[in-house]
Amino acid sequence: MFYSSAYIIRIGVIAILPALPGYAQHAQPVEQRIFQAINQVRQENKLPPLKWHAKIAEVAQSHSRRMATKRFFSHEDPQFGGPDNRLSAAGVAWRLCGENIFEEYGEADPVRSAVRGWMQSSGHRKNILTRGFTHTGIGLARGRDGSYTITQMFAAF
């Protein structure tokens, strides 16, 4: 689903390839690798790569952190609402937005399982392959139990 909106899953393989155009130098290593893998999937489907958006990444990071610390797993934050509300509150003037979320326990490297899981879920796959999305940001949080919580947000302006 996506907003004009999007929503979705706890899932969890795709090859991690060299950096693609549009990578933000401020992304962390896992987020960077997810970004690269998602753009590789888009390239394989003859879609343009997504561009990194630092403000969207901040919103995604905040959502992952809140899910990990407040122990909920949802596109709807009990305090800050859905991705549309969270992006707007951060000053992101989106025209179209979407979100994929992922949570995993016990995996040393969540990149492959996150991307594979998203691609095997119709709603997540739709977000990744929506031609209208032009920008993305990804945020990851580690739980005290070692779990990974990942949020990828998409937008078009």
Regions found by a protein language model. Name each.
Residues 10-19:
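Bacterial N-terminal signal peptides
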Residues 83-157:
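A well-ordered secondary-structure block
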